[in-house]
Structure formats: C-alpha cells, structure tokens
Amino acid sequence: MSLYAPIAAIATAPGRGGIGVVRISGPDLAELAQRLFGRPLTPRHAHYLPFRAADGEVIDEGLAIYFRAPHSYTGEDVLELQGHGGPAVLRRILARCLQAGHDLGLRPAEPGEFTRRAFLNERLDLAQAEAVADLIDASSEAAARGAMTSLSGEFSQRVNDLSDRIIHLRMLVEATLDFPEEEIDFLEKYQARPTLQALTHDLDTLIAQARQGVILREGLHVVLAGKPNVGKSSLLNALAGDDIAIVTPIAGTTRDKVVQEIHIDGVPLHIVDTAGLRDTDDAVESIGIERTWKEIERADLILHLQDVTQPPDHLDAQIVRRLPARTPVLNVFNKVDLLDAAFQGQPDSLAISARGGIGLDALRQRLLQLAGWNPGAESPWLARERHLHALQQAAQHLEIATEHAREDDRVLDLFAEELRLAHEALTGITGKFTSDDLLGEIFSSFCIGK
C-alpha cells in the first residue's frame, strides 16, 4: 500500500442526509478532475456540475471543489464532490471516481488515512490529529469545546514550550560537561536549578489540566451496587431523566446490567445499574450477581446504595468487605422521604430519595467531586490516557534530574540523560518521535473518509 497513491472515500456519515461528500486526496488531482468533468477546476472555487457515469449518465448534480497542495486538509491535492446524501448515489459517485482514477493508482481510503496524511505532511501534529477524532466523537458541548481547543494547537503549544525549555537546560548541562577546561559552571551562571524548578511546576500544572481533559473525554464508569430493592433502578432513571430501567416492588427484577450515559456539567458519566447482591438459589439471578461483581471490579466509582428504612444486616457487611479498596465508594442512603424524622447519616454519605428527587443535585456534585473534576478550573482541552501517561513519565524524569542536580559534577551525565528522557516523553505526545505501531493504532480508530 503506497502512502503516496491517491485515495478516495465517502466522507459523510452512513445513512440518508441532505448532503453527502466524496473526498479524494493525492498527487496531481487536476488530471482526475479533467476526466470526471471534462474541464479544469479553479482551485478553491465551488463549481456546480453534473456528476456523470462513464457512459455519460448523470448520477447527480452538486458542487466540486479542488484544493491544490499544500493548501488543503491533507497537504496534498484534494478534490471534494458534494452531492445529495443518499447512500446509493454516493456509492455510485465513489465508484465512478475509482474507475476514472484507476490507472492513476486511486484506491479506497482506509480509516483515518486522510488525517494520517495531514499528520505526515505536517498539517497537524499527533495531538491535533487525535483531536479531530475526539471532536467527531464528542458527546457533550463541553467535550466538543475541549476537542476544538486541542485541535487549535493550544495543548500542543504547551507541550512544545516545555520541550524547548528542557532542550535549553540540557544544552547548559552538556556545555558544563564538554568544556571543563573553561572552569565555568554553566548551570550556575544561567540559573539552571531555578529553571528546573519552574519547569517542574509548569509540568505539574499541565498534568492536573490533562487529568481534567481525560475525565471530559472518557468520563467515569459509575456502578450502582447494593441489595435488591434499595432503589438502584429508580436512581438510574432519576439521573437519566427517563424510564431506562424496569422498576417493580419484586426483589431481583434487574438481572443484567443496564448502562446509561448522562452528563453533569458536560462531564460524561456511564451509570451502570446492576443486579441486587444477595444469596440466591436462582441460577439466572446468580449469573446476574456474578456480572455485578465484575462491573464493580472495573468501576471508577461505586455508589453503594442502601435502604434507609431498613437496618443494616449481615449482607450489607459482606458487601462492604468485598468492595475493592482501590475504588472510591460513596454510601448513598435512599428513600429518606419515607422517614418520619430527619436522617442522621454517616460522615461522607448522602441521603436521597430517588423517586422524590431529594438530594439528587447534591449527589451530582459529589460525583463530580469524587471524579476529580474542578468546575472552576481553566476551560480544558481534551486529553487521552496516553497524553497523561507521557506527561507523568516526563515528570518522573525531571524529578530524578532534580536529584542529580543537587550532586557534584560526577553525575551531570545522568542529569543530562534524564532531561533527554523527559524531552522524549513529551515529544511522543505531538508525534515528533512516535513508533509506526502507535500511529497505526491511533489512526485505525478514525472513521473512513476522515
């Protein structure tokens, strides 16, 4: 598969729509445009033309726009045909393009190949390319704004600034090592240690913001757990604002998980209603309970729901003992509307009524708090787990470098090496030094046509 052969794909989502787009990218597409339309196209102008089959039959009418390299999304020549959004029409237009460009090497594009070419042609860095996919996948306005901030290059600029400062600091270390006869301590002369402290501080700030970006992009896996009939399904419905789960007075109604995505202040939360936890001889219910524990094991946050009208028993104690210690647990006492007196709850617990709506706003805010979301923070860009991991790796190397900076000149070579490793971790975010395997993994997750 040649990276330089022209490629084509339907760029709009599958299904019917008012407009559909066929996108082509590659070298010298002026020749292909001449074959398709029998005339040259003026770059960056919209031409209203018939789209014809090889025998002259009119398939559709629409706009043809030619972008000459390097002034295009991919950095190559790009030809976009905008017609009506019917699947059959778009398939015929694409087939005609592939037929007309067969001897030019035109082939169907692979997922993400247009954006990969934009990256390889330095129209986007890797973090910006990922932001394209995140913008398409954004499930809330906050996530869309964050993706657009990343696409604009703000996150990349912050990373590049840190990288440049690390390079400058490394130059001072190398100069001290390479010119010992000068008897000049470049680290002292150019205040390298305060520079390293400032670098570490700014990197820590960036890590905190990246955590916000990861939460905004990926959300949290929140599991509702507890005995049967404590109101888990009612709480899911209340948070979702819809009747998602079946609610009955019969214990054991929920036998398999029910997942619903909700948004609180733009943050996506994947709420999982599960089978009630109890001892049972019912084979089907037992399978549901086993699945509940699997969901609990992979949860980011557990809401342990309890019925405030019922005293705790041995089963409650068993559940508490089995909950994973590494996962935050919020004890939620439901059905407070059925109490005659005010409820005296435990510290760090919440009292609610899922059906009556009591305490739900407080619960939503507690969920954000436990997620680590800071609503007063600077409007974040979206980040991925790999970005956060790379930033944390860079911070670890700077921490080790700081230790070496406190020693004598005999460890300056180690100081320089830790700075090199920190720089390498950061440049992996923007793709300056990134393996082909990682690139393949990232771009394969894109939709075809993007």
From Swiss-Prot:
InterPro entries: G_TrmE (IPR031168), GTP-bd (IPR006073), GTP-bd_TrmE_N (IPR018948), GTPase_MnmE (IPR004520), MnmE_dom2 (IPR027368), MnmE_helical (IPR025867), P-loop_NTPase (IPR027417), Small_GTP-bd (IPR005225). Its cofactor is K(+). Homodimer. Heterotetramer of two MnmE and two MnmG subunits. Residues 219-372 form the TrmE-type G domain. Mg(2+) binds at residues 233, 254. The gene is mnmE. One of its GO terms (biological process) is tRNA methylation. This is tRNA modification GTPase MnmE. One of its GO terms (molecular function) is GTPase activity. The keyword Disulfide bond does not apply. The keyword Transmembrane does not apply. It is found in: Cytoplasm. Binds 1 potassium ion per subunit.
